[in-house]
Structures are given as structure tokens and as C-alpha cells.
């Protein structure tokens, strides 16, 4: 674990930060010699990074593996050994020169295929999104239909009172009769009228004016309170439901 931490620190500081700073100075001073030197170093270090990634997964168990990595990075960077320049001129430059045309063709084909693959993936993604939207819409419509079917007729008739007048269905006969009775209530007193069998004589005779109403009630009261019947030459006076017999007074002579 300690060897891994030390090797990682050496690679980051001496393998990346130090060459990056001297590459900046070479670009700033426009020194072609230093510029070529650090360009060769970065090409070799890129290849080293690829090989290191694979070796860390397969050769990390090898004894002194991390110490060898530290020694190799210092050998590449040292101005005395110039390991990066040596590897580039002896191996990389001849290999890249012989395979340059093939590498360029592979790069062009990779760009074209990558563009086509990206377009195909985009179309498939749009198709999947459209299919998912249609499926969700169908499922929601089915849920709404099942919800409406679950309502009973009682629930549907209970909602009819909230509809506009023009859109209400025809009323049943008991509802029409009940509403008709409510409409025939007296507006002055708020008392519903009686049926035809229970109406009094005053109600059956029709409306009167105020004066006629008072006179009519007085006559009816006097007629109901007093009725005279003649039974076998004798008069009986009736006050309401009581009968009062009239006795003859004896005549008094003076």
C-alpha cells in the first residue's frame, strides 16, 4: 500500500507536473529544440499511461512492481538518459510512419460509423419515447373508463343536480309531483294548500278582496254560531254544536 502511494505521487509530480511546466516554457520562448523534446516525451508518456492501466490489473502482484514504475518514469524524464527521446526515435517513430495511412483510414471510418451509430441511437430513443407516451396514454384512458364504469346509477343520478337546466334529463313522476306541490305554496304565508278533499268552503270559493274577506268571514261565523230549526212548532236555537231549547214565558197580566 505504501509503495503504491509513493509510486503514484512520483508519477503525478515528476511524470506530469514537471514536464507540463517545461512544455509551457518551451512554447513561451518558442525554442524549437525544447519544443520537440517535450512533444516526444508526451507521446511516449501517453503510451506508458495505456500500458500502466493494463499492467495495474494484471501485474500488480509482481514483486517490486511499483518500484520499477518509479524507476521507469525517472528514466524517461532524466536529461542524462533521455529515455523518452530514445524510445520515440528507435521504436515509435518508425512504427507510426509505416502505419500512418492505415491509422488515418481507421480514424475516418470511426468518425463516420460513430456519427451513424449516434443517429441510429437517437432515432431508437425517440421511437421508444413515443411508444412509452402512447402506452401511458392508453393506460390512463383505460383507467378512466374503468372508473366511470364503476359508478352506479345512484351515483350518476346524484350528480344530475349540478348540471345546467338545458342538459338535465327528464324527471320522474314522483319528483315532478313533489316539485309541483312545492311550487303551489302560498307566497304570503308560506303554508301549502290542502288537497281538494280537505279544502274549506272559503278556499273553494276563490280569492276575495280585503273588505269582502272580512264581511264573508263575519257572515260565516254568525251562520255557524246560530242556526234556528223548527221542530213541530217549536224553535230550537243552535249555538255551534249545542242545542238550546227556547221555553215559552208565561204571560203576566197586570
Curated annotation (Swiss-Prot):
Segments of skewed composition (Acidic residues): 198-212
Full protein name: Receptor expression-enhancing protein 3
Keywords per UniProt: Cell cycle, Cell division, Endoplasmic reticulum, Membrane, Microtubule, Mitosis, Phosphoprotein, Transmembrane, Transmembrane helix
Transmembrane residue ranges: 1-21, 35-55, 59-79
Organism of provenance: Mus musculus
The keyword Cell cycle appears for this protein: yes
Keyword field contains Transcription: no
Annotated positions of the Phosphothreonine modification: 200
UniProt membrane topology term: Multi-pass membrane protein
Record-stated family: Belongs to the DP1 family.
Residues annotated with Phosphoserine modification: 209
Entry's localization field: Endoplasmic reticulum membrane
Chain's role: Microtubule-binding protein required to ensure proper cell division and nuclear envelope reassembly by sequestering the endoplasmic reticulum away from chromosomes during mitosis. Probably acts by clearing the endoplasmic reticulum membrane from metaphase chromosomes.
Residue ranges, annotated region (Disordered): 162-232
PANTHER family: HVA22-LIKE PROTEINS, RECEPTOR EXPRESSION-ENHANCING PROTEIN 3
Major site of localization recorded for this protein: endoplasmic reticulum
GO cellular component: endoplasmic reticulum membrane; microtubule
GO term, biological process aspect, one: nuclear envelope organization
